[in-house]
């Protein structure tokens, strides 16, 4: 079981987006939110960096360093992947479709 905090749409209190890079989004399948997916953050070399489980509403969130990231969602119903370039601090929203 993943020990990550519960995933919600709201950022934790005290999050300063002028200093922190946050990659967040929703995992979907057939247009519907997909909870219980293992969502992985991979760096620009494909190296595994972190993992969370998507919330019941499909949401996930990572605090990351600036850079190019791949977000991969794994679920018994399939796999989905998306990329994001987050070169500066801020909130970057990613949609991942599992099929």
Label every model-predicted segment.
Residues 1-22:
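Beta-strand-rich domain onsets/edges
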Residues 3, 76-99:
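Structured interaction patches on ligand/partner-binding surfaces of diverse proteins
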Residues 21-23, 29-45:
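Short, ordered, surface-exposed loop/turn motifs in non-cytosolic proteins
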Residues 44-59:
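Short, acidic Ser/Thr/Gly-rich low-complexity loop/linker segments typical of extracellular
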Residues 56, 65-66, 88:
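Surface-exposed loops/turns
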Residues 59-64, 94-96:
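Exposed aromatic-hydrophobic patches
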Residues 66-77:
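A short, solvent-exposed beta-strand micro-motif common in secreted/extracellular proteins
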